[in-house]
Amino acid sequence: MSNPFAYLAEPLDPAQPGKKFFNLNKLDYSRYGRLPFSIRVLLEAAVRNCDKFLVKKEDIENILNWNVTQHMNIEVPFKPARVILQDFTGVPSVVDFAAMRDAVKKLGGDPEKINPICPVDLVIDHSIQVDFNRRADSLQKNQDLEFERNRERFEFLKWGSKAFRNMRIIPPGSGIIHQVNLEYLARVVFDQDGYYYPDSLVGTDSHTTMIDGLGVLGWGVGGIEAEAVMLGQPISMVLPQVIGYRLMGKPHPLVTSTDIVLTITKHLRQVGVVGKFVEFFGLGVAQLSIADRATIANMCPEYGATATFFPVDEVSIKYLVQTGRDESKVKQIRKYLQAVGMFRDYSDPSQDPDFTQVVELDLKTVVPCCSGPKRPQDKVAVSDMKKDFESCLGAKQGFKGFQVAPDHHNDHKTFIYNDSEFTLSHGSVVIAAITSCTNTSNPSVMLGAGLLAKKAVDAGLNVKPYVKTSLSPGSGVVTYYLRESGVMPYLSQLGFDVVGYGCMTCIGNSGPLPEPVVEAITQGDLVAVGVLSGNRNFEGRVHPNTRANYLASPPLVIAYAIAGTIRIDFEKEPLGTNAKGQQVFLRDIWPTREEIQAVERQYVIPGMFTEVYQKIETVNASWNALAAPSDKLYLWNPKSTYIKSPPFFENLTLDLQPPKSIVDAYVLLNLGDSVTTDHISPAGNIARNSPAARYLTNRGLTPREFNSYGSRRGNDAIMARGTFANIRLLNRFLNKQAPQTIHLPSGETLDVFDAAERYQQEGHPLIVLAGKEYGSGSSRDWAAKGPFLLGIKAVLAESYERIHRSNLVGMGVIPLEYLPGENADSLGLTGRERYTIIIPENLTPRMHVQVKLDTGKTFQAVIRFDTDVELTYLHNGGILNYMIRKMAK
């Protein structure tokens, strides 16, 4: 179909008439010039892709008229330029694509129509675990184990890169997806098919937002939604409000980018930005490097926004040059963005656009801080950490409480490790990990950690041998500058050897703790601590034996590792005493900003980025040696425990089946607030007594071969058994933490999977009751696929995290929301009732539907299908069914 906005296309350079761009200034500059820069990107994509069908003329008018329409809950389409995947979410996406090809063929269509039509990059970074640490060969041993465990998955992904066009694999050992995206994959501006246009993307990882720090609009979506984008379907989204975040002033010399982002995270959680964009402006932004901006943008999911945007400016351009991008392309990037009104001068207030609301932060008010012990938004000043932890010890069980009786606050347990005696108590640090894309992409905090390590070693300090220390950089560039600057030996001396290039501890791949440490923690019932430079610290995520976990900057991770406890006041108490009997305080070894900047200027150089990235796709010999078939249809191996054809499309026909009312459903689980996708579908270790473990054992596997839930996402039988299998799940039916529930007809307490299986055998539909922020955390599509396979037809919650709600929609599971001011408690719901949810034939977005109980009580709930497109997916039984029917016709 012809584009009605073709008249806006003109050459960027008269000397190159074949290279055009859509000049949005011609639309209506009085409105366009007032739009937030992030909304301008949405507008450009809509104008360029307008076909009067998927993207209509009225969509462009609605976006251009954002000042009015932002308050009207209006749906607009967005076609991102590309998609990125990581392997934990990428494997199920490729499994779905393979199964969809089978389904299209079965329905009489051309299976090769199932193929990405936009560029797709899949970065393998989630599989490696910290099995070995504190030894020079840790990296090689962990990488060898990664291949041993994941060979079948990797062969499958290699098949996918051959079978599907436009799919590129970045092999294991290359780095973390978001740092590789920032340093290498990001185009900033596309030059394709004769047009320049802004780079934009969605990714199957919630921290995809990190790229917004470079001025590339992107955010995390569920794997199901990403698959639809890959097949050419636009994302259907409610036109977001945009919160302007003004930064002023300069940070204190002791403050790191981590401190700034933890402060912003707490602030924006309080402001309330769920479902909104945040766009930064003000003189303070110019003080921040791209690495600092990327750190702030990375934590976007932790404060609940959809995207956190830093428009491109001179600092962005310098970063592109610094990271080895082609200088002629960088000039074109600047020229295009200036021509289309998307290049920013943060010192010029006349460029400040209109915002829905403006909030601000003076950077000089930020103090060194951590976040924890169970949520990233629970910021604690470093000066208050000791007092805060001791308060949490005795507080009621909750986000800030462990309910330890006062007479047990000083409990301790001695143990023998490597022939020496040590003592653990509440607050003892047993994991200290410099990890995650959030911080390892930032040279200032990484070099700061290295310089602190050097000073600590020079002062005679060390880390106790039982503390599990690790360094997992986000790319080879980090190792390069740590080695070249001479700080790597000091990090190694304190136990922070490079253990792998990947997410590792941040996603729960922290590996085992020493057995004597685990015994001391469990026998003493101690609240042990993990300290990590990550972005999430939900209970049970980092390690099953660390009940308290704090997010901190890399230098503070080392400081707490040396101290050995979180119960320390750094101002008043020494980090330790050296062999000479001298007390050494944190202030004695903390590097100055000038020291860090001098080292950064000398060692973080373009040649380093070029050397690392020019061989990134070919340097891994183990990956190169993998064999993979070249068939267009995947040959499923019935004996495989990693890759299995999913049951989602088994009974699919071309005929639509309209949604039906849910009649006499039982409640499988009665949950509270902030149930995360980690609770719903854990990514970490498979417990030996779990339904998933029984499944694997029955197939002849030993516990050593179980691997993790995340690595098993290509097998629906394991993932269904792993649904709600988190040992920290708090189900109100039981009033204790356990991956169990009550089978209401019999009154038996069973594992969640076993209870769901029995309900399904009895022919009973199921629902889940929940509180606020249901599904927060990772963009985990199995947190929707798993409940679907358990027979859960609907979830009734007070509110949903954005990505999880869209994943439920994508699977045809109905997200219901209590009316404002209502919840399970106010309505007197126990969860032991039977629920009938009336789904009318004339269903409309966000319609109020009736819920009837077998007690005779009735109430209204909002059906959270927010757009007409989402209702179309419901009528098809989910988004993938819709795409298969579309491709098979």
UniProtKB/Swiss-Prot annotation:
Predominant place of localization: cytoplasm
Cofactor note: Binds 1 [4Fe-4S] cluster per subunit.
GO cellular component, one term: cytosol
Catalytic activity, reaction form: citrate = D-threo-isocitrate
EC number of the protein: 4.2.1.3
Needed cofactors: [4Fe-4S] cluster
Subcellular location: Cytoplasm, Cytosol
GO biological process: citrate metabolic process; response to iron(II) ion; tricarboxylic acid cycle
Residues noted as binding [4Fe-4S] cluster in the record, renumbered to the chain: C437, C503, C506
EC top class, as a word: lyase
PROSITE patterns from the UniProt entry: ACONITASE_1 (PS00450), ACONITASE_2 (PS01244)
Binding residue positions for substrate: Q86, D205, S206, H207, R536, R541, R699, S779, R780
Role of this protein: Bifunctional iron sensor that switches between 2 activities depending on iron availability. Iron deprivation, promotes its mRNA binding activity through which it regulates the expression of genes involved in iron uptake, sequestration and utilization. Binds to iron-responsive elements (IRES) in the untranslated region of target mRNAs preventing for instance the translation of ferritin and aminolevulinic acid synthase and stabilizing the transferrin receptor mRNA. Conversely, when cellular iron levels are high, binds a 4Fe-4S cluster which precludes RNA binding activity and promotes the aconitase activity, the isomerization of citrate to isocitrate via cis-aconitate.
Quaternary context: Interacts (when associated with the 4Fe-4S) with FBXL5. Interacts with frataxin(81-210).
Record protein name field: Cytoplasmic aconitate hydratase
Gene source species: Oryctolagus cuniculus (Rabbit)
Organism taxonomic ancestry: Eukaryota, Metazoa, Chordata, Craniata, Vertebrata
